[in-house]
Protein backbone atom coordinates (compact mmCIF):
# COMPACT_ATOMS: atom_id res chain seq x y z
CA UNK A 1 0.00 0.00 0.00
CA UNK A 2 1.20 3.49 -0.85
CA UNK A 3 1.93 5.76 2.09
CA UNK A 4 -0.87 8.26 2.76
CA UNK A 5 1.04 10.37 5.30
CA UNK A 6 2.15 13.98 5.01
CA UNK A 7 5.67 12.80 4.12
CA UNK A 8 4.34 12.09 0.64
CA UNK A 9 1.88 14.96 0.26
CA UNK A 10 3.88 16.40 -2.64
CA UNK A 11 2.63 13.44 -4.72
CA UNK A 12 -0.99 14.59 -4.27
CA UNK A 13 -2.87 16.93 -6.64
CA UNK A 14 -3.53 19.20 -3.63
CA UNK A 15 -1.21 19.00 -0.63
CA UNK A 16 -2.34 18.98 2.98
CA UNK A 17 -0.21 22.06 3.64
CA UNK A 18 -1.95 23.91 0.79
CA UNK A 19 -5.40 22.96 2.11
CA UNK A 20 -4.55 24.11 5.64
CA UNK A 21 -3.10 27.36 4.27
CA UNK A 22 -6.32 27.98 2.29
CA UNK A 23 -8.42 27.59 5.45
CA UNK A 24 -6.19 30.15 7.17
CA UNK A 25 -6.30 32.57 4.22
CA UNK A 26 -10.10 32.36 4.17
CA UNK A 27 -10.29 32.99 7.91
CA UNK A 28 -11.78 29.57 8.62
CA UNK A 29 -10.70 28.60 12.13
CA UNK A 30 -9.24 25.11 12.28
CA UNK A 31 -7.08 23.21 14.68
CA UNK A 32 -4.49 20.79 13.29
CA UNK A 33 -3.47 17.70 15.22
CA UNK A 34 -0.38 15.73 14.18
CA UNK A 35 -0.35 12.02 15.04
CA UNK A 36 0.84 8.65 13.78
CA UNK A 37 -0.58 7.57 10.44
CA UNK A 38 -3.97 5.86 10.79
CA UNK A 39 -5.77 3.96 8.06
CA UNK A 40 -8.89 2.66 9.79
CA UNK A 41 -11.50 3.80 12.28
CA UNK A 42 -10.04 1.37 14.83
CA UNK A 43 -6.58 2.95 14.44
CA UNK A 44 -8.09 6.43 14.55
CA UNK A 45 -9.80 5.70 17.86
CA UNK A 46 -6.38 5.02 19.37
CA UNK A 47 -5.13 8.56 18.60
CA UNK A 48 -8.34 10.45 19.45
CA UNK A 49 -7.19 10.85 23.04
CA UNK A 50 -4.51 13.26 21.79
CA UNK A 51 -7.11 15.91 21.04
CA UNK A 52 -10.41 14.92 22.63
CA UNK A 53 -11.66 16.07 26.00
CA UNK A 54 -15.10 16.40 27.53
CA UNK A 55 -15.35 19.93 26.12
CA UNK A 56 -14.09 19.38 22.59
CA UNK A 57 -15.81 16.17 21.56
CA UNK A 58 -17.33 16.04 18.17
CA UNK A 59 -18.08 14.09 15.07
CA UNK A 60 -15.53 11.50 14.19
CA UNK A 61 -16.24 10.23 10.73
CA UNK A 62 -15.58 7.40 8.36
CA UNK A 63 -15.33 8.00 4.65
CA UNK A 64 -16.03 5.44 1.96
CA UNK A 65 -15.19 5.79 -1.72
CA UNK A 66 -17.81 3.83 -3.64
CA UNK A 67 -18.87 3.15 -7.21
CA UNK A 68 -22.18 1.98 -8.52
CA UNK A 69 -23.12 -0.31 -11.40
CA UNK A 70 -23.12 2.67 -13.78
CA UNK A 71 -19.57 3.65 -12.71
CA UNK A 72 -20.76 6.69 -10.76
CA UNK A 73 -18.21 7.76 -8.12
CA UNK A 74 -19.55 8.39 -4.62
CA UNK A 75 -18.01 9.63 -1.38
CA UNK A 76 -20.03 8.52 1.64
CA UNK A 77 -19.35 10.24 4.97
CA UNK A 78 -20.85 8.83 8.15
CA UNK A 79 -20.28 8.81 11.89
CA UNK A 80 -17.33 6.53 12.62
CA UNK A 81 -19.45 4.00 14.52
CA UNK A 82 -22.18 3.69 11.91
CA UNK A 83 -22.61 0.23 10.44
CA UNK A 84 -22.74 0.59 6.67
CA UNK A 85 -24.88 -1.79 4.62
CA UNK A 86 -24.15 -1.07 0.96
CA UNK A 87 -27.50 -2.52 -0.18
CA UNK A 88 -29.41 -0.15 2.10
CA UNK A 89 -27.23 2.81 1.11
CA UNK A 90 -27.73 1.98 -2.58
CA UNK A 91 -31.50 2.15 -2.11
CA UNK A 92 -31.29 5.39 -0.13
CA UNK A 93 -29.24 7.18 -2.79
CA UNK A 94 -31.00 5.52 -5.75
CA UNK A 95 -28.04 3.52 -7.03
CA UNK A 96 -27.60 -0.07 -8.06
CA UNK A 97 -24.96 -2.43 -6.74
CA UNK A 98 -22.53 -0.28 -4.75
CA UNK A 99 -18.97 -1.50 -4.28
CA UNK A 100 -15.71 -0.04 -3.05
CA UNK A 101 -13.67 1.81 -5.65
CA UNK A 102 -10.09 0.76 -6.37
CA UNK A 103 -7.12 2.64 -4.95
CA UNK A 104 -6.21 3.82 -8.46
CA UNK A 105 -9.69 5.24 -9.06
CA UNK A 106 -9.65 6.75 -5.58
CA UNK A 107 -6.48 8.64 -6.42
CA UNK A 108 -7.67 9.61 -9.91
CA UNK A 109 -11.03 10.90 -8.70
CA UNK A 110 -10.39 12.21 -5.18
CA UNK A 111 -6.64 12.80 -5.21
CA UNK A 112 -5.94 10.86 -2.00
CA UNK A 113 -4.50 7.50 -1.03
CA UNK A 114 -6.32 4.72 0.85
CA UNK A 115 -6.43 5.58 4.54
CA UNK A 116 -6.71 9.32 3.89
CA UNK A 117 -10.19 9.55 2.37
CA UNK A 118 -11.89 12.69 3.63
CA UNK A 119 -14.67 15.14 2.73
CA UNK A 120 -11.85 17.60 1.97
CA UNK A 121 -10.89 15.40 -0.99
CA UNK A 122 -13.91 16.89 -2.76
CA UNK A 123 -11.52 19.74 -3.58
CA UNK A 124 -10.47 17.32 -6.34
CA UNK A 125 -13.66 15.24 -6.47
CA UNK A 126 -15.96 18.06 -7.57
CA UNK A 127 -14.22 18.43 -10.93
CA UNK A 128 -14.34 14.64 -11.37
CA UNK A 129 -18.11 14.44 -10.79
CA UNK A 130 -17.84 12.59 -7.48
CA UNK A 131 -21.12 12.79 -5.57
CA UNK A 132 -20.89 13.48 -1.84
CA UNK A 133 -23.39 12.01 0.63
CA UNK A 134 -23.16 12.84 4.34
CA UNK A 135 -25.10 11.25 7.16
CA UNK A 136 -27.65 13.78 8.43
CA UNK A 137 -26.82 13.29 12.11
CA UNK A 138 -23.37 14.83 11.47
CA UNK A 139 -25.08 18.23 11.15
CA UNK A 140 -25.75 18.14 14.90
CA UNK A 141 -22.05 17.86 15.79
CA UNK A 142 -20.36 20.95 17.18
CA UNK A 143 -17.08 19.89 15.56
CA UNK A 144 -16.18 17.40 12.85
CA UNK A 145 -12.77 15.76 12.74
CA UNK A 146 -11.30 14.80 9.37
CA UNK A 147 -7.98 14.12 7.71
CA UNK A 148 -6.69 17.08 5.68
CA UNK A 149 -5.86 14.82 2.67
CA UNK A 150 -3.23 12.83 4.62
CA UNK A 151 -3.66 10.29 7.40
CA UNK A 152 -1.15 11.53 9.97
CA UNK A 153 -3.05 14.76 10.64
CA UNK A 154 -6.56 15.52 11.78
CA UNK A 155 -8.29 18.89 11.64
CA UNK A 156 -11.35 20.17 13.43
What does each model-found stretch correspond to?
Residues 1-156:
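Extended, low-hydrophobicity, polar/charged segments
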Amino acid sequence: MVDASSKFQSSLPVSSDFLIQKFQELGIPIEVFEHEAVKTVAESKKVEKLFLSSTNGGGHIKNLYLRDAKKKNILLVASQDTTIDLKIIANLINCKRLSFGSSDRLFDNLGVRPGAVTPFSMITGVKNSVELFMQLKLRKCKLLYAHPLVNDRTVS
